[in-house]
C-alpha cells in the first residue's frame, strides 16, 4: 500500500534566516489528513538553521543529549474506507527550528482570519493548547546571528469563529469550579518539570483543513483546545513556546474531537523516516496487510500500551511477556530489567566486534563496539519482537553509529528502566505506526514515509545464510551520513547550553485541575 502515492515536498525557501517551510502537495492516499513532522537535529533542520554549537547528528554529544532528555519521560503519567481525503491547507507548513525544545513539531493554522502556530507534538498528553491573550508569552525565537522568527499569539476576540467552551460542556472536567453552568470552562495542566504549567480556558475554533483531492475543498474542522493565558516554568525559556498538540486517548485530544465530529476516523499514524523527518496522518486506519497487536487501555490515564511476548536476537529466542508503551516522543528504547538483559546479553554474545569500553559521561549506552579502521561494513545480530497475537516486529534500527576521538563505534541503542518499558523512536524508524483508537489496535508496516512501500532499510541489509552463525544484518557505516571528520569537541557557547537544557525537557502531565 502506498502511503502517499504521489506526494512530494516543496521547499519554499527561507522566509527569514531563522525559518523555512515545507508545503504539502495535493496527493492521492488514504482517508486521512496529515502533515510532516521533523526531528530537531535532523539534516534538514541543521541545513536550514545552522546553530552555534549544535551537536553533530552522529556525535556522542548528540546521543547524550537525546538520552538525557528521554530519561525525563519517566515521570509522565503514563471511520470508513471511503472517507474523503483531508489534509492541512497550504500554509500549515512544518517548521523545524533549532531553538525549539521539543524534537518533533509542526505548523497548524487556526482561526478566522487564520494564524499559524508552531506546536510541539506529544502522544503522552491530551490537550491541544495555544498561547492566548497572555502578556508574558514567548513572542519570538532567536537564531545565532541575531535573526528572529515572530510567533503568533492566539486571541478569541480576534477570530470570528472562536467560541468559549461553557462549564456544562462534556469536555469541561472541572465544572465544579465554575460560578455557573454557562461560565467559561477553566483548565490548568501541571507538568513535572520545575513548576511548569499552562492555565486558561477552553475554546473552540477552526483548524483549517482541505480535502485531499482535485477539488481541494475547504473543511473547517472545529476543535476544542486550551486558550493558554498563563504559562509558567520552561514555557518561558523556549520549550513548546507556541503551543502543544496533544495526541493522547482522552476525549479532549484533537484525534478524539475529529473522530467525534465525523471529520476523520478515530485513528492516526506516525511515520518515522531514516532522515529524522516524518509524517503524522489523522484518519489513517492502516492497511489490510499491516501487522497488528491489541492496545492495553488502562484507566484512569490510558496510554498506547502493548504486550510483547517473545524476543529474538540472532538465533537466541526467549519467551518473555512484558508491557511497553509506544511513545513517539521518546528518542531511544527503554526496557525493564528482564527484557533489557535478554536483548543486551544475547546481542553481546553474538557481536563480532570488540566491546568498546565507555563511561556514562561519554555515551549513554552500555553495549558499544569499536569498528576496525579498515572495515567498510559490519554484521550484527538481528533483533525481533513478537507481539501479543503473534505478529512479528523486526527492529530495523536498533543501533547508532557514533564517531569517537579514536574510532567509530556502534551501540545497541537501548537503556534500562525500572518501571514500564518504552518503545521509542529508534525502534519505530522505518515504519508507519498506526494508532487505531477505534479498534484498539496498534498496527505497523514498513515505509520510507514518502514514496510508500519501499524497504524500511536504507542501509544495506542481508540475512546471514551461514549455518555457522545466527541470523545477522549487514550495516554499512558509510550509508549513515557520518561526517568524514571527527566532531569538534571544543566548549559550546552559552546559547547552545540553553538550547540543550530545553531539549532535555519532556512534558509530563500530572492532572487537569
Swiss-Prot record:
Instruction: Report domain Peptidase A1 positions.
Output: 104-445
Q: Where is the composition biased (Low complexity)?
A: 455-474
Kindly state one GO CC term assigned in the UniProt record.
Answer: plasma membrane
Q: Which GO terms describe its molecular function?
A: aspartic-type endopeptidase activity
What is this enzyme's class at the first EC digit? hydrolase
Q: Which residues form a coiled coil?
A: none
Q: Which InterPro entries match?
A: Aspartic_peptidase_A1 (IPR001461), Aspartic_peptidase_AS (IPR001969), PEPTIDASE_A1 (IPR033121), Peptidase_aspartic_dom_sf (IPR021109), TAXi_C (IPR032799), TAXi_N (IPR032861)
Task: List the propeptide residues.
Answer: 485-513
- The EC designation for this entry is 3.4.23.-
Q: How does it sit in the membrane?
A: Lipid-anchor; GPI-anchor
Q: Which PANTHER family match?
A: ASPARTYL PROTEASE FAMILY PROTEIN 1 (PTHR13683:SF826), ASPARTYL PROTEASES (PTHR13683)
Its biological purpose: Aspartyl protease. Not able to cleave BAG6.
Protein's name according to its UniProt entry: Aspartyl protease family protein 1
Q: Which organism is it from?
A: Arabidopsis thaliana
- Gene encoding it? APF1
Amino acid at each position: 500500500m502506498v502511503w502517499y502515492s504521489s506526494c512530494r515536498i516543496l521547499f519554499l525557501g527561507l522566509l527569514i534566516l531563522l525559518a523555512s517551510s515545507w508545503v504539502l502537495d495535493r496527493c492521492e492516499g488514504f482517508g486521512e489528513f496529515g502533515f510532516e513532522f521533523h526531528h530537531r537535529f535532523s539534516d534538514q533542520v541543521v541545513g536550514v538553521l545552522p546553530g552555534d554549537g549544535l551537536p553533530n547528528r552522529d556525535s556522542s554529544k548528540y546521543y547524550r543529549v537525546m538520552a538525557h532528555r528521554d530519561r525525563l519521560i519517566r515521570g509522565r503519567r503514563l471511520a470508513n474506507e471511503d472517507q474523503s481525503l483531508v489534509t492541512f491547507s497550504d500554509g500549515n507548513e512544518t517548521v523545524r527550528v533549532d531553538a525549539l525544545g521539543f524534537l518533533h513539531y509542526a505548523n497548524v493554522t487556526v482561526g478566522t482570519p487564520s494564524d499559524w502556530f508552531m506546536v510541539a507534538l506529544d502522544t503522552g498528553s491530551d490537550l491541544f493548547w495555544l498561547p492566548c491573550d497572555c502578556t508574558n508569552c514567548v513572542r519570538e525565537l532567536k537564531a545565532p546571528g541575531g535573526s528572529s522568527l515572530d510567533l503568533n499569539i492566539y486571541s478569541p476576540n480576534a477570530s470570528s469563529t472562536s467560541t468559549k467552551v461553557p462549564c456544562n460542556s462534556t469536555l469541561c472536567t472541572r465544572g465544579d469550579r465554575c460560578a455557573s453552568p454557562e461560565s467559561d470552562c477553566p483548565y490548568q495542566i501541571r507538568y513535572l518539570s520545575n513548576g511548569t504549567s499552562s492555565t486558561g480556558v477552553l475554546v473552540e475554533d477552526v483548524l483549517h483543513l482541505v480535502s485531499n483531492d482535485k477539488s481541494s475543498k475547504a473543511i473547517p474542522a472545529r476543535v476544542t483546545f486550551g486558550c493558554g493565558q498563563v504559562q509558567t516554568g520552561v514555557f518561558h525559556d523556549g520549550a513548546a513556546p507556541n503551543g502543544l498538540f496533544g495526541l493522547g486517548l482522552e476525549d479532549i485530544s484533537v484525534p478524539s474531537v475529529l473522530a467525534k465530529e465525523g471529520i476523520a476516523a478515530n485513528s492516526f499514524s506516525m511515520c518515522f523516516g531514516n532522515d529524522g523527518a516524518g509524517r503524522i496522518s489523522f484518519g489513517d486506519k492502516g492497511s489490510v496487510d499491516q501487522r497488528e497487536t491489541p492496545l492495553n487501555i488502562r484507566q484512569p490515564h490510558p496510554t498506547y500500551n502493548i504486550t510483547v511476548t517473545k524476543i529474538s536476537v540472532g538465533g537466541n529466542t526467549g519467551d518473555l511477556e512484558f508491557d511497553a508503551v509506544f511513545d513517539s516522543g521518546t528518542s531511544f528504547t527503554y526496557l525493564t530489567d528482564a527484557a533489557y538483559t535478554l536483548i543486551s546479553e544475547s546481542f553481546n554474545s553474538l557481536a563480532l566486534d570488540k566491546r568498546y569500553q565507555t563511561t556514562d559521561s561519554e555515551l549513554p549506552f552500555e553495549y558499544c563496539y569499536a569498528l576496525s579502521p579498515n572495515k567498510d561494513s559490519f554484521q550484527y545480530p538481528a533483533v525481533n519482537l513478537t507481539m501479543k497475537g503473534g505478529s512479528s516486529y523486526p527492529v530495523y534500527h536498533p543501533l547508532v553509529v557514533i564517531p569517537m576521538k579514536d574510532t567509530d563505534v556502534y551501540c545497541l541503542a537501548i537503556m534500562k528502566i525500572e518501571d514500564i518499558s518504552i518503545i521509542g523512536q529508534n525502534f519505530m524508524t522505518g515504519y508507519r505506526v498506526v494508532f487505531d483508537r477505534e479498534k484498539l489496535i496498534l498496527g505497523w508496516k514498513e515505509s520510507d514515509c514518502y514514496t510508500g512501500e519501499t524497504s524500511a532499510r536504507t542501509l544495506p541489509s542481508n540475512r546471514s545464510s551461514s549455518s555457522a552463525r545466527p541470523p545477522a544484518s549487514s550495516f554499512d557505516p558509510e550509508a549513515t551520513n557520518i561526517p568524514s571528520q571527527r566532531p569538534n569537541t571544543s566548549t559550546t557557547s552559552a546559547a547552545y547550553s540553553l538550547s540543550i537544557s530545553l531539549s532535555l525537557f519532556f512534558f509530563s502531565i500530572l492532572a487537569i485541575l
